[in-house]
């Protein structure tokens, strides 16, 4: 086949494979466009979980008639014009791919009007060449996007959609995350004609805790400790739940934002977990809603197709900063609560040195302790002050927010007599669920670790293999399958075909979906860890392995796959090692307690120390 330029629709559909995973992906991209347009009200209408209709209506600035056709074209955007703009990006969108990708796998209609125009205009793309048609329409200032029949022209993708309830739950979760990021925007969500969520905008200086409670629940609000922490260009604000009262339900609340962009960043999660480690049980997770503000030049947001991940230029600095910010609030909580009256000379309190996998602590310097209000004591009406407008909070932020908490709780708990302390189990050591902190990388694939004064070497490829095996091994539910945009078709022998058919149920639990005919097998979906692998090599080797087996256990197959996956890292960096260890500690805690052979080797420094002393 000769080299040729792909038709626009096919090119957009390929891009949609990364951008548009499910209806929730469409909602996220379109709502972020509305926020970038300055909207203060966004109405979202969903039908049949988003498979039939997704309608996003906003009161933003709108799009000019002359730019409507461009809005549906690939790589057309108003957010950036040069590489310098990309490196300092503050808007949520910037690639100009979303609308083109969505319109290629659905029937998309874009209606918009700007304040300077007397009438609105409507645009839609159709045909193989994605020609855009523009016609007059009636519409107030703002934009409405209608997405009908998602994946109507890609049946394979539509087949992988879950139930209507499941898909809507994903949309609901996306809206929760966005509502937590933008307290100044009213967001209404309806499903099949019924209003499901109404998040009203909080006026400047208003009580953001009301919206926090509506989204995260009263249980989180009651245990929330407010954070305001700053160092240079870094600012951390938000709430973390008291680890001593964290429940499994609360542990599901883990929201972090970087410059207003919702993230699932492992480095941030690791720093928070390390700060709470000595107060959490072995199986507990922290609950938090945190906002990190950082110089846009110090973070790269262009590392994930859906912009779910970021890369910090100084990851160790960010890790230590977040760790110390969370730790300071938890340490303050241990102090005796003080009244709300201003303390003219607050006593300084030294923050203990932290233990983090990211390395040396840059922030363990004395900090001023803010008075912490008792959580259940009603405040006098005459002595209260309005909460400082978040995120531009003034000093004393935690004290002011304590007042808000008590006003929201309304019903104070009755005074109780102090109880004698109950015997408690000894707390786990802070390092009990951690390999230690990474000091440096040795010989490109080993991490030098320090834990409790002991030095050890960890083989990063071995840790990566154990992590892959944990990711591939099915638990209570099968591993999630990721559909391939272009299925892999392979020729197989009769023996190989028979083995595949016997192993089909086990492979399905691992997220591997295939279809076979007389002499061929077509791989239609694989689990996420396999998406970046060379399947042309891996799958034939897997089929050969299965042909030699008589028993097909998902665990054994997952172990074989993990051992045969190619590593993504030829030369490991500190940031990659920290991220890997955070994932291993979270998914494979048993490796910390009883490391298998070949993973961890202690380093005896006593001969070297003795030799130095003998000189």
Curated annotation (Swiss-Prot):
Please list where the region (Disordered) is annotated: 362-397
Going by the UniProt record, its keywords in alphabetical order are: DNA damage, DNA repair
GO BP annotation list = mismatch repair
Q: Which PROSITE patterns match?
A: DNA_MISMATCH_REPAIR_1
Q: What CDD domains does its record include?
A: HATPase_MutL-MLH-PMS-like, MutL_Trans_MutL
Coiled coil ranges (UniProt) are: none
- Keyword DNA repair assigned to the entry: answer is yes
InterPro entries in alphabetical order: DNA_mismatch_repair_CS, DNA_mismatch_repair_MutL, DNA_mismatch_S5_2-like, HATPase_C_sf, MutL/Mlh/PMS, MutL/Mlh/Pms-like, MutL_C, MutL_C_dimsub
* Pfam families in alphabetical order: DNA_mis_repair, HATPase_c_3, MutL_C
Q: Where is the composition biased (Low complexity)?
A: 378-391
Q: Which GO terms describe its molecular function?
A: ATP binding; ATP hydrolysis activity; ATP-dependent DNA damage sensor activity; mismatched DNA binding
Q: Which GO terms describe its cellular component?
A: mismatch repair complex
Q: Which HAMAP family match?
A: DNA_mis_repair
Query: Entry's NCBIfam families?
Result: mutl (TIGR00585), PRK00095.1-1 (NF000948)
User: Matching PANTHER family, A to Z?
Assistant: DNA MISMATCH REPAIR PROTEIN MLH, PMS, MUTL, DNA MISMATCH REPAIR PROTEIN MLH1
> In which family does this protein belong, per the annotation?
Belongs to the DNA mismatch repair MutL/HexB family.
What does it do?
A: This protein is involved in the repair of mismatches in DNA. It is required for dam-dependent methyl-directed DNA mismatch repair. May act as a 'molecular matchmaker', a protein that promotes the formation of a stable complex between two or more DNA-binding proteins in an ATP-dependent manner without itself being part of a final effector complex.
Q: What is this protein called?
A: DNA mismatch repair protein MutL
Protein species of origin: Escherichia coli O17:K52:H18 (strain UMN026 / ExPEC)
Gene that produces this protein: mutL
């Amino acid at each position: 086949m000769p080299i040729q330029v792909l038709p626009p629709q096919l090119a957009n559909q390929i891009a949609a494979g990364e951008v548009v995973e499910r209806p929730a992906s469409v909602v996220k991209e379109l709502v972020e466009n509305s926020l970038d347009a300055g909207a203060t009200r966004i109405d979202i209408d969903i039908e049949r979980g988003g498979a039939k209709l997704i309608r996003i209506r906003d009161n933003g600035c709108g799009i000019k008639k002359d730019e409507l056709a461009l809005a549906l074209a690939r790589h057309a955007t108003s957010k950036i014009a040069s590489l310098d703009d990309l490196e300092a990006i503050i808007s949520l969108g910037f690639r100009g791919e979303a609308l083109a990708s969505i319109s290629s796998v659905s029937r998309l209609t874009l209606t918009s009007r700007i304040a300077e125009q007397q009438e609105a205009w409507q645009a839609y793309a159709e045909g193989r060449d994605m020609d855009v048609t523009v016609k007059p329409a009636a519409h107030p200032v703002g934009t409405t996007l209608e997405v009908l029949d998602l994946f109507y022209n890609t049946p394979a993708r539509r087949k992988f959609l879950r139930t209507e309830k499941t898909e809507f739950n994903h949309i609901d979760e996306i809206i929760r995350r966005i509502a937590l990021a933008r307290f100044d925007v009213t967001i209404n969500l309806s499903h099949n004609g019924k209003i499901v969520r109404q998040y009203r905008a909080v006026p400047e200086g208003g009580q953001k805790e009301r919206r926090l409670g509506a989204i995260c629940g009263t249980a989180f609000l009651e245990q929330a400790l407010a954070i305001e922490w700053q160092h240079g260009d870094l600012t951390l604000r938000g709430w973390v739940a008291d680890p001593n009262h964290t429940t499994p339900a609360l542990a599901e609340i883990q929201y972090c934002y970087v410059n207003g962009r919702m993230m699932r960043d492992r480095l941030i999660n690791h720093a928070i977990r390390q700060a709470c480690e000595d107060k959490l049980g072995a199986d507990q997770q922290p609950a938090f809603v945190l906002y990190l503000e950082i110089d846009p030049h110090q973070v790269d947001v262009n590392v994930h197709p859906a912009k779910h991940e970021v890369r910090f230029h100084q990851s160790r600095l960010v890790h230590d900063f977040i760790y110390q910010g969370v730790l300071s609030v938890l340490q303050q909580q241990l102090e005796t609560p003080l009244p709300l009256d201003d303390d003219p000379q607050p006593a300084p309190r030294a923050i203990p040195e932290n233990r983090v996998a990211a390395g040396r602590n840059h922030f363990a310097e004395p900090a001023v302790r803010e008075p912490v209000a008792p959580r259940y004591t009603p405040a006098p009406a005459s002595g209260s002050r309005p909460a400082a407008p978040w995120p531009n909070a003034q000093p004393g932020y935690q004290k002011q927010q304590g007042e808000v908490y008590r006003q929201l709780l309304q019903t104070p708990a009755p005074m109780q007599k102090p109880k004698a302390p109950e015997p408690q189990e000894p707390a786990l050591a802070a390092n009990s669920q951690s390999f230690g902190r990474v000091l440096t990388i040795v010989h490109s694939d080993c991490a030098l670790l320090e834990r409790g004064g002991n030095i050890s070497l960890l083989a990063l490829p071995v840790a990566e293999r154990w992590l892959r095996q944990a990711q591939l091994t099915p638990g209570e539910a099968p591993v999630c399958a990721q559909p391939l945009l272009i299925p892999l078709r392979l020729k197989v022998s009769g023996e190989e075909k028979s083995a595949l058919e016997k192993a089909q149920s086990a492979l399905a639990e691992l997220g591997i979906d295939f279809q076979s005919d007389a002499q061929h097998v077509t791989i239609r979906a694989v689990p996420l860890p396999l998406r970046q692998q060379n399947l042309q090599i891996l799958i034939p080797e897997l089929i050969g392995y299965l042909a030699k087996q008589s028993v097909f256990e998902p665990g054994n197959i997952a172990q074989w796959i993990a051992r045969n996956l190619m590593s993504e890292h030829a030369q490991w960096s500190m940031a990659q090692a920290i991220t890997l260890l955070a994932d291993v500690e979270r998914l494979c805690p048993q490796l910390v307690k009883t490391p298998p052979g070949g993973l961890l080797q202690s380093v005896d420094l006593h001969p070297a120390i003795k030799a130095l002393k003998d000189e």
